[in-house]
Amino acid sequence: TTDMSCQAFVTMATTDAYCMGATAVARSLRRYGTSRSIVVMVTPNVSEESRRSLWAVFDQVVLVDLLDSSDHLHLSWLRRPELGPTFTKIHCWTLTHFSKCVFLDADTLVLCNVDELFDREELSAAPDPGWPDCFNSGVLVLRPSKNTHRLLLEHAVRHGSFDGETAAAAPRRRQGNGGERYQKLLFFHRPKQSERKTHEIY
């Protein structure tokens, strides 16, 4: 049997403003009765006050270093300058005290119990709406590994991201026998009026 205490939903807050979204993620998971731990990664620029508020709703608040794609040209073209620090989610692979994690962006809203995502294999993700050959890293099933973390960092430093997000940063699995490079998830994607993406999981 699977030890559910060794599995976690993970989100991330790189600013005080993102703490509000992360809190909404945690509350929506608890509202629908998740049996897994709920973890938030925060960067040093998140204030102590915000971190204390996160401890009220999360099981763990983990401090990580800020990574930045520094791809200002593509970020400007996409009109998404806030995406620069999204490489920070690569630190999910350092959470090796968990056997499996499901990463949810801070703009994700859970609308039912989604614990079944832990039955999925690494690397499960949804196709990116704008780039179907790549995956969108807003909802991602992964197995923490220090070695994978090292490889992802090396890949990010060497290749960066063609759109400023991590969707293209992770080296995709080799495709063999006609198989997918990654396991596809289905979820509804609805842009907010502000043009920021939000992921609604049914």
Question: How would you label these PLM feature ranges?
Answer:
Residues K146-Y202:
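Catalytic core and acceptor-binding pocket of nucleotide-sugar-dependent glycosyltransferases
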